[in-house]
């Protein structure tokens, strides 16, 4: 097969590309330039997709012995990921930009261009597995190394996208093994640290970054009864489940800490309450997709496990499609669910699909 290897400049994508070559594929490496911000256009800058990352990717491609290109996807990234991130926070939601990048850039824009150029598949360094069932359908599964499993952030992929995707690291038992393999191959990125920041906010100051773009308008902090108990300097800076940074000048009557329960951008208010009020009995979202054949017909409940964060434990649940939404009821309450988060549903290790959470029903009445 002709394979386009997406090379971020890190160790995972470099080893994935090398394994694709070893498997006998005709491989071409490509690095995606996703930002034109001055802070990313010099060596030593943090985040991903910097000039230094591009240089690391090129060195890896040279060692592996494959052609290498840099493609400018910065405009598409700004529109589909950065602008979406700003819009979601402005609406009082908590988005996951990595999932949006996978959905709109790596497995949409990049894959579309790859197919147009005659490639058969896109290869990445994600830790996930693709399994072909008895009927020849490709299924997305968790990686062998659950500690590094990234199937959650790939939950947005459709069956058509999975048909043209390769994840060579899915069967690798540990990241240490990947680093050892990179060193044995002579790849200089073998000891390169992982990137954990949002790539377009490399200093990690999400609150300050949003304030520059959304603005910071003083508003009220309310308790669950609607009583004003404090003020904030911009509702966009808060997310459901947050405890730190609340400007409340006196303790709650029972002395227990308060947590953000809701962000209301329309009236610029933040609602807080006790930790148990974060327990959620049901979540639902209208923007859902399946990673293959839907597990059940509409209005028919099906058993699954639901995961609402990249490294959260899956929780047994019952889900169904009803009223144009994917509705999920966990067997035990979920904690700290924010609108805008993604709920990925599994059957064992297999990813069934996902939805962006629009609403969350509290398990604790007001």
UniProtKB/Swiss-Prot annotation:
It is found in: Cytoplasm. Residues 148-150 are annotated as: Interaction with tRNA. Disulfide bonds join 101-199. One of its GO terms (molecular function) is tRNA-uridine 2-sulfurtransferase activity. It comes from the Bacteria. The active site is at residues 101, 199. Gene3D superfamilies: Adenine nucleotide alpha hydrolases-like domains, HUPs, Translation factors. This is tRNA-specific 2-thiouridylase MnmA.
């Amino acid at each position: 097969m002709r394979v386009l290897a997406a090379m971020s400049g890190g160790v995972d994508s470099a080893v994935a590309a090398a394994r694709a070559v070893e498997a006998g594929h005709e491989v071409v490496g490509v690095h995606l330039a996703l930002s034109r911000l001055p802070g990313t256009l010099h060596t030593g800058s943090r985040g991903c997709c910097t000039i230094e990352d591009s240089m690391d990717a090129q060195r890896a491609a040279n060692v592996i012995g494959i052609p290498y290109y840099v493609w400018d996807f910065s405009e598409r990234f700004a529109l589909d990921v950065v602008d979406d991130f700003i819009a979601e926070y402005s609406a009082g939601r908590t988005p996951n930009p990595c999932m949006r990048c996978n959905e709109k850039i790596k497995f949409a824009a990049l894959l579309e261009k790859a197919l147009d150029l005659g490639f058969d598949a896109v290869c990445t360094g994600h830790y996930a597995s693709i399994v072909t069932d008895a009927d020849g359908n490709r299924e997305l599964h968790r990686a062998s190394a659950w500690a590094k499993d990234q199937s959650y952030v790939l939950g947005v992929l459709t069956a058509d996208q999975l048909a043209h995707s390769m994840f060579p690291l899915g069967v690798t038992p540990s990241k240490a093994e990947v680093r050892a393999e990179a060193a044995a191959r002579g790849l200089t990125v073998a000891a390169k640290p992982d990137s954990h920041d949002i790539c377009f906010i490399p200093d990690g100051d999400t609150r300050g970054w949003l304030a520059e773009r959304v603005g910071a308008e003083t508003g009220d902090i309310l308790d669950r009864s609607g009583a004003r108990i404090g003020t904030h300097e911009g509702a966009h800076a808060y997310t459901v489940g947050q405890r730190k940074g609340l400007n409340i000048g006196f303790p709650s009557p029972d002395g227990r800490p308060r947590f953000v329960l809701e962000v209301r951008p329309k009236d610029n208010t933040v609602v807080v309450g006790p930790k148990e009020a974060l327990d959620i009995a049901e979540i639902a979202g209208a923007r859902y997709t399946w990673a293959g054949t839907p597990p059940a017909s509409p209005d028919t409940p099906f058993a699954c496990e639901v995961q609402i964060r990249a490294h959260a434990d899956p929780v047994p649940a019952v889900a169904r499609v009803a009223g144009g939404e994917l509705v999920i009821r966990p067997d035990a309450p979920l904690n700290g669910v924010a609108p805008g988060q993604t709920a990925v549903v599994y059957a064992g290790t297999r990813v069934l699909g996902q939805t962006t959470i629009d609403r969350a029903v509290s398990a604790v009445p007001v």
